[in-house]
């Protein structure tokens, strides 16, 4: 389809691009006085800076292909935009609201506002968006538009110190303001203003004003006659007409033909102008068009604008267009050949390390790349594909360090405590040393939040001298994030595994899958199933990424996963992992971490010196036990930071910290180094302040007092801790000094670690045959069943111990577990419930320093439980000295640190009879 011709009846046609190119609405033509002008109505996005492109008047024509991946059909759509012609024959197009007046009446002499252009002159026939920051100028432009005289003069700024700026964006935004001359007599100001701009410019019509952006359409040449006013700069101008010339002159014709021939070479390299018909342009229009689309500098273009001899103007344009042809040829060579050469160098460099099946694919794609033109969309796709293939670290491995002593030192530096976890990691490294490699193992670090799972993974990588890459899979629901997108999708990319190898630059990094228990799942696939191929040692040697479509070797990668709850990990995935539990930190470990790490780090981060504040050990202990009982130390760090922020505010209010004695009014006179400020006396500081700000005597006295004031060291202990962190979050768990009849202390495991739990029983009513049990406390099904079993076992034991006691047969009982708002479940309270029932039946108190835990069977056997470490910590926190554990948990308790076991009287039982003796026969 050939470009349509336009008549000169004043119609204009707006070509609207698809919605995703909706920021640009191009006006195909603006006709006036048998001329066609380029125009635009649009809102320029922030990424497009007007006036900086070598072809600034065409920037918005080029913007779609620069900012988006247009295909050929899109370029064809925009290519059929205008016929730059003064012919009136052709087909009438549908009219829209005309930008230009259909019947303009312009005098040869006009008074217009002069707008300075910093980067390039406005060539007649082209449009140019500019930014106007000056409110007076902007208001004047809007007023001229309302009065049906939307014309201004556009003049190129001369090169001078007052307008040059190191920041191009600053020049664009403030060029009108910088153009002003201040502090000189009126006559000199006017003369200097006129000397700053070229006298020959362009009469421009205001196409639209949107905010601070004004779109100008070049109309004709003009020259400044005189200045009318300064603010805004208004000048009287005259139109410049081309000198007469002979169209039949052979020399002019030859220049015209040569310009057309050369210009067509330029148009071929620009997909937006490739279909432009320039054969029917007039001589002067052809010269202007060639200069406008060339990448010439502003001085060359100003020369074309100033030249009124059409033949000389054609010669100037021919010079510019020839230079543009040479530039385009060099650019084609650089963009096409150099890109191909880079790919070839990469392939040849790594050829010995790249697998043969990958080399075959690379060669096929490289051959295809050499046959494609750079402007084709397939060129970018092929280059991108080869780029990813060639940047992967084929055969590049980092040296693995299996020094166990070094690894232990690194783990101790990064983490305090966690001795069992460190020991397990050292075992893993030792096995790797004997085997010569650590591949084939997948470690899963399981534990509550804040215990250091992610940082341990990073420490393992540092100990092994492997590169580290963290991939958070929490909430991940798209398989393509792992295995990549197919190349047929727009914006396709490789998966995270390929991106990881590219990022770290080695083929044997340590990849950490963070929060693997929180994987999502949706219609796009199951990421957990995709991870099976990634982490399975039998499959990941030939891992297939959908984007690359070639197999890559992940068998040398060491995978480490982190999870809070391993039960949430799919079974097949969990089966491939070796789980290491991080149960958390005990109080002693938290104290060391807080004192040796967290407090020091927070001091540095808050800019507080150690001599400014004293945080006592008692305050830290109270903070740990009453505010931060969770297994990790993340919340403990937050609370310490909260304390030191308040301390910082208090110190600043006291004037204890140094302040910056500077003032923006005179930065040179106040510039002092830190050491100089420290050596300065108060009087010297006051002199500087007085000279810079002119403060009154009263103000100087106050500031002197502020600097000279001595500060009081902030003391924080258990008594005033609440002033910094608020009231305690956790109350003391021990409710009773001596538990009453029917009340027994049990031990429970929670996500916060461990806690004590009271089991309370009382009777509701008594009467012959009214025996029964009512349960409250938001208990789960397992715990309710455990209560029923405990009730039955207690009746049996009571019948054996005291056959005449009919308490259970004639009493309706109510069992309650306090903190009813907290859901509770689990079987480990069975023995505690039995003891509570028996205490009520015998009306006998249970030993006051006793806590117990253990699941009970219907025959009275005690079964093992979990969370021995956490429950032991909870017992110590409540000053419990005697603990009853199931016999099967003896080994778990013996593995605990000595400081945790110290001072405890622990009994291990396998049947309830032993618990009965410990709980009720304490007198003996």
Curated annotation (Swiss-Prot):
Subcellular location: Mitochondrion matrix
GO biological process, any: chaperone-mediated protein complex assembly
Targeting signal (transit peptide) range: 1-63
First-level EC class: hydrolase
Keywords from the named record: ATP-binding, DNA-binding, Hydrolase, Mitochondrion, Nucleotide-binding, Protease, Serine protease, Transit peptide
Annotated PROSITE patterns: LON_N (PS51787), LON_PROTEOLYTIC (PS51786), LON_SER (PS01046)
Catalytic residues in the record: 828, 871
Gene3D superfamilies named in the record: 1.10.8.60, 1.20.5.5270, 1.20.58.1480, 3.30.230.10, LON domain-like, P-loop containing nucleotide triphosphate hydrolases
Main localization (coarse): mitochondrion
Regions crossing the membrane: none
Pfam family for this entry, one: AAA
Lon N-terminal domain span: 112-325
Residues involved in ATP binding: 447-454
Domain Lon proteolytic: 738-922
Alphabetical list of InterPro entries matching this protein: AAA+_ATPase (IPR003593), ATPase_AAA_core (IPR003959), Lon_bac/euk-typ (IPR004815), Lon_lid (IPR054594), Lon_proteolytic (IPR008269), Lon_Prtase (IPR027065), Lon_prtase_N (IPR003111), Lon_prtase_N_sf (IPR046336)
Catalytic activity from the UniProt record: Hydrolysis of proteins in presence of ATP
GO cellular component: mitochondrial matrix; mitochondrion
Enzyme nomenclature, EC number: 3.4.21.53
A GO MF label: ATP binding
Family named by the database record: Belongs to the peptidase S16 family.
Subunit structure: Homohexamer or homoheptamer. Organized in a ring with a central cavity.
Function: ATP-dependent serine protease that mediates the selective degradation of misfolded, unassembled or oxidatively damaged polypeptides as well as certain short-lived regulatory proteins in the mitochondrial matrix. May also have a chaperone function in the assembly of inner membrane protein complexes. Participates in the regulation of mitochondrial gene expression and in the maintenance of the integrity of the mitochondrial genome. Binds to mitochondrial DNA in a site-specific manner.
Annotated protein name in UniProt: Lon protease homolog 3, mitochondrial
Organism name: Arabidopsis thaliana (Mouse-ear cress)
Taxonomic lineage from the root: Eukaryota, Viridiplantae, Streptophyta, Embryophyta, Tracheophyta
Name of the gene this protein is made from: LON3
């Amino acid at each position: 389809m050939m470009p349509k011709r336009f008549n000169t009846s004043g119609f204009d046609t707006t070509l609207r691009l698809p919605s995703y190119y909706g920021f640009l609405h191009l006006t195909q033509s603006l006709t006036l006085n048998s001329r066609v002008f380029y125009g635009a109505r649009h809102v320029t996005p922030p990424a497009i800076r007007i006036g900086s492109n070598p072809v600034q008047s065409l920037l918005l024509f080029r913007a779609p292909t620069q900012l988006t991946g247009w295909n050929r059909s899109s370029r064809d759509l925009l290519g059929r935009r205008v016929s730059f012609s003064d012919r009136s024959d052709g087909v009438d197009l549908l009219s829209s609201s005309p930008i230009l007046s259909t019947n303009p009446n312009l005098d040869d002499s006009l008074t217009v506002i002069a707008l300075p252009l910093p980067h390039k002159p406005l060539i007649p026939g082209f449009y140019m968006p500019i930014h106007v920051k000056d409110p007076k100028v902007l208001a004047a432009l809007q007023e001229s538009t309302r009065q049906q005289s939307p014309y201004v003069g556009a003049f190129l700024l001369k090169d001078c110190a007052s307008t040059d700026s190191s920041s191009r964006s600053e020049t664009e935004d403030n060029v009108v303001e910088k153009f002003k001359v201040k502090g000189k007599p009126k006559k000199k100001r006017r003369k200097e203003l006129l000397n700053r701009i070229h006298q020959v410019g362009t009469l421009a019509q205001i196409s639209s004003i949107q905010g601070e952006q004004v779109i100008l359409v070049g109309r004709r040449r003009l020259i400044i006659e005189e200045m009318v006013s300064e603010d805004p700069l208004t000048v009287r101008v005259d139109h410049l007409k081309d000198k007469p010339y002979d169209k039949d002159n052979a020399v002019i014709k030859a220049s015209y033909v040569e310009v057309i021939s050369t210009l067509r070479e330029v148009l071929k390299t620009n997909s937006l102008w490739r279909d432009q018909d320039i054969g029917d342009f007039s001589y002067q229009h052809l010269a202007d068009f060639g200069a406008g689309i060339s990448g010439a500098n502003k001085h060359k273009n100003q020369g074309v604008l100033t030249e009124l001899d059409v033949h000389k103007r054609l010669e100037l344009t021919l010079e510019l267009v020839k230079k543009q042809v040479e530039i385009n040829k060099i650019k084609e060579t650089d963009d096409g050949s150099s890109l191909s050469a880079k790919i070839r160098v990469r392939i040849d460099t790594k050829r010995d390390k790249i697998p043969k099946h990958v080399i075959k694919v690379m060669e096929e794609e490289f051959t295809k790349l050499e046959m494609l033109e750079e402007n084709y969309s397939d060129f970018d796709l092929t280059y991108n594909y080869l780029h990813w293939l060639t940047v992967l670290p084929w055969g590049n491995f980092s040296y693995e360090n299996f020094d166990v002593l070094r690894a232990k030192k690194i783990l101790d530096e990064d983490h305090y405590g966690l001795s069992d976890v460190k020991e397990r990691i050292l075992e893993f490294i030792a096995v790797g040393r004997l085997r010569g490699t650590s591949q084939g193992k997948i470690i899963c670090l399981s534990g509550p939040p804040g215990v250091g799972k992610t940082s341990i993974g990073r420490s393992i990588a540092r100990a092994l001298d492997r590169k580290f890459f963290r991939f958070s899979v929490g909430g991940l629901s798209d398989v393509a994030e792992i295995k990549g997108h197919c190349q047929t999708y727009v914006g396709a990319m490789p998966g995270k595994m390929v991106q990881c190898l590219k990022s770290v630059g080695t083929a044997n990094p340590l990849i950490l899958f963070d929060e693997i228990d929180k994987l999502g799942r949706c219609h796009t696939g199951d990421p957990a199933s995709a991870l099976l191929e990634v982490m399975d040692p039998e499959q990941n040697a030939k891992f297939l990424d959908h984007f690359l479509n070639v197999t890559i070797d992940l068998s040398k990668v060491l995978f480490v996963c982190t999870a809070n709850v391993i039960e949430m990990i799919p079974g097949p995935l969990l089966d491939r992992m070796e789980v290491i539990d991080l149960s958390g930190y005990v109080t002693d470990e938290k104290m060391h971490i807080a004192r040796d790490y967290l407090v020091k780090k927070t001091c540095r981060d808050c800019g507080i010196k150690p001599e400014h504040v004293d945080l006592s050990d008692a305050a830290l202990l109270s903070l740990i036990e009453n505010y931060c009982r969770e297994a990790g130390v993340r919340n403990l760090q937050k609370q310490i930071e909260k304390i030191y922020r308040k301390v910082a505010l208090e110190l600043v209010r006291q004037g204890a910290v140094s302040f910056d004695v500077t003032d923006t009014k005179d930065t040179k006179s106040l510039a002092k180094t830190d050491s100089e400020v420290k050596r300065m006396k108060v009087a010297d500081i006051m002199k500087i302040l007085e000279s810079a700000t002119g403060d009154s005597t009263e103000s100087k006295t106050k500031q002197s007092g502020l600097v000279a004031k001595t500060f009081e060291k902030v003391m924080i202990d258990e008594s005033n801790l609440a002033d910094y962190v608020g009231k305690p979050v956790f109350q003391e768990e021990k409710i009773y000094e001596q538990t009453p009849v029917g009340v027994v202390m049990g031990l429970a495991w929670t996500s916060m670690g461990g806690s004590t739990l009271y089991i309370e029983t009382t009777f509701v009513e008594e009467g012959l045959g009214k025996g029964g049990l009512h349960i409250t406390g938001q208990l789960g099904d397992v715990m309710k069943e455990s209560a029923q079993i405990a009730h039955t076992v207690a009746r049996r034991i009571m019948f054996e111990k005291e056959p005449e006691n009919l308490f259970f047969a004639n009493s309706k009982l109510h069992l309650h577990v306090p903190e009813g708002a907290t859901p509770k479940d689990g079987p480990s309270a069975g023995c505690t419930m039995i003891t509570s029932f028996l205490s009520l039946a015998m009306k006998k108190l249970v030993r006051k320093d006793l806590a117990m835990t253990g699941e009970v069977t219907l025959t009275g056997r005690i079964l093992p439980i979990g969370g021995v470490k956490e429950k032991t910590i909870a017992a110590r926190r409540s000053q419990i000295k005697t603990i009853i554990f199931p016999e099967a948990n003896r080994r778990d308790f013996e593995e605990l640190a000595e400081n945790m076991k110290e001072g405890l009287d622990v009994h291990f039982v396998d049947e309830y009879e032993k618990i009965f003796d410990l709980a009720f026969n304490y007198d003996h």
